[in-house]
């Protein structure tokens, strides 16, 4: 018998990717989907969901209460408004959420089952009912480096990120493309003239970038032809919230730190927004607990998850396989630039790329739903 599952936020960017992945993997054969909407209750369910009833009101607590499992990609404001009311009304079901709202709550598990399935299983056994997707950058990094973390080889790690526009949302992606288009328009006559001086073209681009009329309401400053070395809120101590998440969430995913009675792994670095569309990249400096030969490190990484792909540390392989353009739309997490650093044999350099909308958002939720279907 199929389980009824409530789906909220299925039309947004993350939700749309989640729905496509569920269709690709035939997950809908395992559930009876109940589609909710925050703005179109009573409307038609998606045409591809055969037999699904009309859209339910996503704020109707009584309707939500009937479901043993709810999956939401509606965002943090929705979670903040609806979740407490739902639990307050006595609902005991499983809540699977893409938003960060509940991520660090004591009664929530951050889900990334290829890396932390034992943590998830233990939580289900003790009655945990809240399962939340992790920060996109953290999840993609762990999918690549699980082999090192799960073999307890990482003493500390520094991560310098190159994060895509998609991390901000759909409107941020649109704004980036709009900026690129306007910058091109500003110098197109010069670009079309082979005799035009490149410095004249450069001055034209800069003038347009610095023009206050360039659309920048979402990023706050131009991102096209630029970068922004700050993501998310200012915590007031020189650290951004995005940077704080690296250590906090990695350790929670792995079941480490004070809450688990084990030492946390120190992780810190800087988070930077770049003009890529939907893949987050990271340059990593890793202090290993012991000197491990590079070929053994490569084997451990390749065996860590089936999606981790070691890229040979050559120029040709790197530029072909270790880029956002190569990775977008795939579940592969390539890990490359692997080499021992000059600081010593325990210091490892690495670079990894992951699709922010797949392992960084939708895929852990989809897989958690599969796990929950055996438990609900």
Curated annotation (Swiss-Prot):
Q: Where is the active site?
A: 136 (acyl-thioester intermediate), 280 (proton acceptor)
- Which of this chain's residues are annotated to bind phosphate? 103, 245
Cite the EC number. Answer: 1.2.1.11
**Catalytic reaction(s) noted:** L-aspartate 4-semialdehyde + phosphate + NADP(+) = 4-phospho-L-aspartate + NADPH + H(+)
Q: For this UniProt record, give its keywords in alphabetical order, as a comma-separated list.
A: Amino-acid biosynthesis, Diaminopimelate biosynthesis, Lysine biosynthesis, Methionine biosynthesis, NADP, Oxidoreductase, Threonine biosynthesis
Q: Which residues bind substrate?
A: 163, 242, 273
The pathway to which it is assigned is: Amino-acid biosynthesis; L-lysine biosynthesis via DAP pathway; (S)-tetrahydrodipicolinate from L-aspartate: step 2/4; Amino-acid biosynthesis; L-methionine biosynthesis via de novo pathway; L-homoserine from L-aspartate: step 2/3; Amino-acid biosynthesis; L-threonine biosynthesis; L-threonine from L-aspartate: step 2/5
A GO molecular-function annotation: NADP binding
* BP-aspect Gene Ontology terms: 'de novo' L-methionine biosynthetic process; diaminopimelate biosynthetic process; isoleucine biosynthetic process; lysine biosynthetic process via diaminopimelate; threonine biosynthetic process
Establish whether keyword Cell membrane is in the entry. Answer: no
Instruction: Please name the Gene3D superfamilies in this protein's record.
Output: Dihydrodipicolinate Reductase, domain 2, NAD(P)-binding Rossmann-like Domain
Positions binding NADP(+) in this chain are 11-14, 38-39, 74, 166-167, 194, 356
- Entries under InterPro entries matching the protein: Asp-semialdehyde_DH_CS (IPR000319), Asp_ADH_gamma-type (IPR011534), Asp_semialdehyde_DH (IPR012080), NAD(P)-bd_dom_sf (IPR036291), Semialdehyde_DH_NAD-bd (IPR000534), Semialdhyde_DH_dimer_dom (IPR012280)
Question: Sorted alphabetically, which SUPFAM superfamilies does this protein's record hold?
Answer: Glyceraldehyde-3-phosphate dehydrogenase-like, C-terminal domain, NAD(P)-binding Rossmann-fold domains
Function description? Catalyzes the NADPH-dependent formation of L-aspartate-semialdehyde (L-ASA) by the reductive dephosphorylation of L-aspartyl-4-phosphate.
Q: How does it assemble?
A: Homodimer.
**Record PANTHER family:** ASPARTATE-SEMIALDEHYDE DEHYDROGENASE, DEHYDROGENASE, PUTATIVE-RELATED
| Family stated for the protein in its record | Belongs to the aspartate-semialdehyde dehydrogenase family.
For this protein, the record's HAMAP family field holds: ASADH
What name appears for this protein in its UniProt entry?
A: Aspartate-semialdehyde dehydrogenase
Q: What is the lineage of its organism?
A: Bacteria, Pseudomonadati, Pseudomonadota, Betaproteobacteria, Burkholderiales
């Amino acid at each position: 018998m199929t389980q009824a599952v409530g789906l909220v936020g299925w039309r947004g960017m993350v939700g749309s990717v989640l729905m496509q992945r569920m269709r690709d993997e035939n997950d809908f054969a395992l559930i009876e989907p109940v589609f909710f909407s925050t703005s179109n209750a009573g409307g038609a369910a998606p045409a591809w969901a055969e037999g699904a009833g009309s859209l339910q009101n996503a704020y109707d607590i009584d309707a939500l209460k009937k479901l043993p499992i709810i999956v939401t990609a509606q965002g943090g404001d929705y979670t903040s408004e609806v979740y407490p009311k739902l639990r307050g009304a006595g609902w005991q079901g499983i809540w699977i959420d893409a938003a960060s709202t509940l991520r660090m709550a004591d009664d929530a598990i951050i889900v990334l089952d290829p890396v932390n399935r034992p943590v998830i299983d233990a939580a289900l056994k003790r009655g945990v009912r809240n399962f939340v997707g992790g920060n996109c950058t953290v999840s993609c990094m762990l999918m690549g480096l699980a082999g090192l973390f799960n073999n307890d080889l990482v003493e500390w790690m520094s991560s310098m990120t190159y994060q895509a526009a998609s991390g901000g949302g759909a409107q941020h992606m649109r704004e980036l493309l709009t900026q690129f288009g306007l910058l091109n328009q500003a110098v197109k006559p010069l670009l079309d003239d082979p005799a035009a001086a490149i410095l004249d073209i450069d001055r034209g681009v800069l003038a347009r970038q610095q023009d206050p009329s360039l659309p920048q309401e979402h990023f706050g400053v131009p991102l096209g032809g630029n970068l922004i070395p700050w993501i998310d809120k200012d915590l007031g101590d020189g650290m951004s919230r995005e940077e704080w998440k690296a250590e906090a969430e990695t350790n929670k995913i792995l079941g480490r730190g004070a809450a688990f009675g084990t030492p946390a792994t120190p992780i810190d670095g800087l988070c930077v927004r770049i003009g890529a569309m939907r893949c987050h990249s990271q340059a990593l400096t890793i202090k290993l607990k012991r000197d491990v030969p590079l070929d053994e490190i490569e084997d451990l990484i390749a065996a860590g998850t089936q999606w981790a792909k070691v890229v040979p540390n050559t120029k040709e392989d790197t530029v072909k396989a270790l880029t956002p353009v190569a990775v977008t739309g795939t579940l592969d997490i390539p890990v490359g630039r692997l080499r021992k650093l000059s600081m010593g044999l325990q210091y490892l350099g690495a670079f990894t790329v992951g699709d922010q909308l797949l392992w960084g958002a939708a895929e852990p939720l989809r897989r958690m739903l599969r796990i929950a279907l055996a438990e609900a």
